[in-house]
């Protein structure tokens, strides 16, 4: 059962839309894909990232936990006065979707080192499952540093970063953004997969024109 983890250089970088694009791309390649959101914070019932992914892709997903306040998950649980997420619980939950022909696409919360529980991060979960990563980055001024730090943190933990993806690029990018697009691959040392246009409201049509060769490494499902 292969996993693919999607993390960001921070919050609000376009991680959910990027996850939707990757989910739809894999599904269009004939894979059985399950999108998963580990922890949602600061959203009302029936709202949030996993519901946005379903709206964008038509593929329903699963969510492990949610908290009321828009905070890091461990802080949100603490403030709410509830038991923090336990590492063994989240690993067991993910492994419960066991199916050798399914790809589980896991969207994190914020960045790679955000605490999901009091003593573990998304990086720890990805490492336990031997899962590769896609890092979603902003594209404007300051983004090169954030992307390089995220890839370096992943590499130091023995994680494989398949690529860096720009979560959103404006229709009329400024000079810093245009130069960053040329630099991401050089400074991070991993393939840069381009950037998603700002304001896209659906992934169908857009995904058909994209190519993510690194994802082709996932075993193709048998013909039916």
Curated annotation (Swiss-Prot):
Signal peptide: none annotated. Pfam families: AAA_26. Gene3D superfamilies: P-loop containing nucleotide triphosphate hydrolases (3.40.50.300). It is found in: Cytoplasm. Its cofactor is Mg(2+). The keyword Secreted does not apply. Substrate binds at residue 41. One of its GO terms (biological process) is biotin biosynthetic process. Pathway: Cofactor biosynthesis; biotin biosynthesis; biotin from 7,8-diaminononanoate: step 1/2. GO terms for cellular component: cytosol. The keyword Cytoplasm applies. Transmembrane segments: none annotated. Its EC number is 6.3.3.3. The active site is at residue 37. Homodimer. Catalyzes a mechanistically unusual reaction, the ATP-dependent insertion of CO2 between the N7 and N8 nitrogen atoms of 7,8-diaminopelargonic acid (DAPA, also called 7,8-diammoniononanoate) to form a ureido ring. Belongs to the dethiobiotin synthetase family. This is ATP-dependent dethiobiotin synthetase BioD. It comes from Corynebacterium glutamicum (strain ATCC 13032 / DSM 20300 / JCM 1318 / BCRC 11384 / CCUG 27702 / LMG 3730 / NBRC 12168 / NCIMB 10025 / NRRL B-2784 / 534). The gene is bioD.
């Amino acid at each position: 059962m292969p996993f693919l983890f999607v993390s960001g250089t921070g919050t609000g970088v376009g991680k959910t839309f990027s996850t939707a694009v990757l989910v739809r791309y894999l599904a269009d390649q004939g894979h059985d894909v399950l999108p998963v959101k580990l922890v949602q914070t600061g959203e009302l019932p029936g709202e949030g990232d996993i519901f946005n992914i379903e709206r964008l892709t038509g593929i329903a997903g699963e969510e492990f936990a949610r908290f009321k306040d828009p905070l890091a998950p461990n802080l949100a649980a603490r403030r709410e006065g509830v038991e923090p997420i336990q590492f063994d619980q989240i690993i067991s939950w993910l492994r419960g979707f066991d199916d050798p022909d399914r790809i589980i696409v896991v969207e994190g919360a914020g960045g790679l080192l955000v605490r999901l529980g009091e003593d573990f991060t998304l990086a720890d979960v990805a490492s336990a499952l031997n899962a590769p990563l896609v890092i979603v980055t902003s594209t404007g001024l300051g983004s090169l540093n954030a992307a390089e730090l995220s890839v370096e943190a992943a590499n130091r933990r023995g994680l494989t970063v398949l690529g860096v993806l720009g979560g959103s690029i404006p229709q009329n990018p400024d000079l810093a953004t245009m130069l960053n697009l040329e630099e991401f691959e050089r400074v991070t040392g991993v393939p840069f997969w381009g950037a998603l246009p700002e304001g896209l409201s659906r992934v169908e049509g857009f995904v058909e024109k994209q190519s993510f060769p690194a994802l082709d490494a996932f075993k193709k499902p048998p013909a039916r």
